[in-house]
Design a protein with these regions (language model features):
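Flexible, glycine-rich terminal cap/loop adjacent to redox cofactors
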Residues: 3-17, 22-134
Length: 134
């Protein structure tokens, strides 16, 4: 069930948190480090976020490493309560993270961030915004 928290910034979430996923695999006798993959993408890497000034935010995807199925998605940032529904639909349909990452997203949009976070699960995101090094 997708959840929206209408704070500033907004929070959108669906499915398991990273810790919940790791705990479940550990309880099942599996190595949580090998069983769970995580992809992240910062709003700062999105052209739309740059244009609107909404660069503070993060999209996080939690995935079953063996099946590539999405276990949870968490978004913190502008329009997170709207963006979470694409992830909820993908999970409802049993889509793999690879299938969602392959879907073409309009540019420039905040929704591209979900695609990039999905791509990051397998190290394929190309627009990652890195924290400045000191």
């Amino acid at each position: 069930i997708p959840t929206g928290i209408f704070t500033l910034p907004e929070i959108g979430r669906v499915g398991l948190t990273e810790q919940q996923a790791r705990d479940r695999y550990l309880a099942a006798g599996k190595d949580p480090q090998q069983s769970v993959r995580v992809g992240r993408f910062r709003y700062g890497g999105l052209g739309k976020a740059q244009a609107t000034g909404d660069i503070q935010g993060l999209l996080k995807v939690i995935v079953d490493a063996e099946s590539d199925r999405i276990l949870g998605v968490h978004i913190l940032g502008a329009h997170a309560t709207d963006l979470i529904h694409e992830a909820a639909l993908a999970m409802h349909l049993g889509a793999t993270v690879s299938r969602v990452a392959e879907m073409i997203h309009a540019h420039p949009t905040l929704a591209e961030g979900l695609m990039e976070a999905m791509e990051d699960v397998h190290g394929h995101a190309i627009h990652l915004a890195r924290k400045p090094s000191s």
